[in-house]
Amino acid sequence: MPTPTRAQLEKWGRGYAELWNAGDKPAWIANWKSVAPGEFRMLDPVGTPEKRGFEECASKPYDLFQPALRLVVPEATRFICANEVTWVMENHFTVDGELIVLRSIENFRFEPDRSVTIRTFYDVPSSDSPLGRFFSKYLPGVA
């Protein structure tokens, strides 16, 4: 199988934030599966234990973060180079009525076997920070 086309990756990239922000988990999953129905691997962020499988890499994080998180990808920070997509994500968390923005660099490498490897870069919030309750669950022993 070939890697996803540029048009497919552009559509997926638009849907990534739009469908997340709409709270439409079934459509968000279908968007993912349209470009990566195979194996998922994720280092989120790089330097933490690797996650594997769609549930660990996408579905469980959606359930944990979605209600408090709005995703923003400025168009000027989105790059598609062959089979890889990279962007600077603005993660807009609302915690106890307060807006907290955490920026991350996110890279997605789509392979011919329709697998994907995700690598992100950000400073993990400490467990005693306003975001600590999320990251203590997401990265136990790290946050």
Task: Label the model's feature ranges.
Residues 1-35, 138-143:
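Short, low-complexity N-terminal intrinsically disordered segments enriched in polar/charged residues
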Residues 13-14, 46, 90:
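A short, structure-level motif marking secondary-structure boundaries and short turns
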Residues 3, 8, 63-143:
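A beta-strand edge to alpha-helix "cap/lid" segment located at domain peripheries
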Residues 9, 17, 42, 51, ...:
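N-terminal/domain-start segments enriched in small and hydrophobic, helix-friendly residues
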Residues 19, 46-48, 93:
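Short histidine/acidic/glycine/proline-rich micro-motifs that form metal-
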Residues 6, 26-84:
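A solvent-exposed, acidic/Ser-Thr-rich amphipathic alpha-helical stretch
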